[in-house]
A protein has these predicted regions:
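Nucleotide-activated chemistry modules centered on ATP-dependent adenylation/adenylyltransferase
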Residues: 1-255
Length: 255
């Protein structure tokens, strides 16, 4: 006997996942729940790994608005946070006993343990009773990503209704559900502490959330790692940040 289906949308609160939810509502597609996995930088201090402006918008604007439309939103977090992962010690090899340190381009354990693991645990609670259909935000103009959905339990409503990424953004704008991550036409999603982040993001964090940047500095020196983009040291990254801030100030004085 087949199990009943449960329809769950995986949502990052970016344009594609929000547009997916809106299309489901507009077209009476089955939608039982929405799940958002929040990466945590430090549970103890209550520091999220999400871009500060984005996570504030998620909790204060996006979730309340979706819930007012009848959408059930579940937030999950991993048992481990980024700080804990960085402090874990290697058990074997030449570096046994040393801390893992900051994530690197070679291995992003923050994604696997802080984001993916809690999502998998969330799905597991339904898997015995239901066949899970997962709505994912992949637009019709992303053919390679869509091809990977074949033969899985993942469904793209954006593709079903012929939505491109540009159309997904327009749908979010229609409902006034656009994350601050898209300000200025540039998407700035992902974790604020990511090794691969551009310098302007770090400048924004240091300027507006100095205790966040200090937390990264402390962790960098505590774990004795060099794990910024292209293997740059913290000193090299901060010199680039200082240079960018200097140039930004000079541009402002011209006007």
């Amino acid at each position: 006997m087949s199990k009943p289906k449960i329809y769950i949308a995986l949502c990052s609160f970016g344009k594609d996942s929000i547009a997916t939810i809106l299309l489901a509502l507009e077209n009476n597609e089955p939608l039982d729940r929405v799940v958002f996995s929040e990466v945590m930088f430090d549970h103890e201090r209550g520091i999220s790994g999400e871009i500060p402006e984005h996570i504030e918008w998620v909790y204060n604007t996006a979730i309340p608005k979706l819930e007012s439309m009848g959408v059930k939103v579940d937030v999950v977090r991993g048992k481990l946070d980024y700080v804990t992962l960085c402090r874990r010690k290697l058990k074997s090899g030449k570096k046994a006993g040393q801390m893992y340190g900051l994530q690197s381009a070679r291995f992003c354990y923050a994604n696997s343990e802080c984001k993916v693991a809690p999502i998998n645990a969330y799905y597991k609670q339904f898997s015995k009773e239901y066949d899970i259909v997962k709505y994912v935000g992949i637009a019709i103009d992303e053919p390679k990503r869509l091809a990977r959905l074949e033969g899985t339990n993942k469904v793209s409503l954006l593709a079903k209704y012929g939505y491109t990424e540009k159309m997904a953004m327009a749908k979010c704008e229609e409902y006034d559900l656009v994350s601050p991550n898209y300000r200025g036409g540039e998407f700035r999603g992902g974790c604020w502490f990511c090794y691969n982040a551009n310098i302007s993001r770090y400048v924004n964090i240091r300027k507006n959330y100095p205790h966040y940047w200090q937390a990264i500095r402390d962790l960098y020196y505590e774990t004795n790692t060099k794990a910024f983009k292209y293997g740059k040291t913290l000193a090299e990254v901060e010199r680039e940040m200082d240079s960018l801030e200097f140039n930004q100030r000079n541009q402002l004085t011209l006007f």
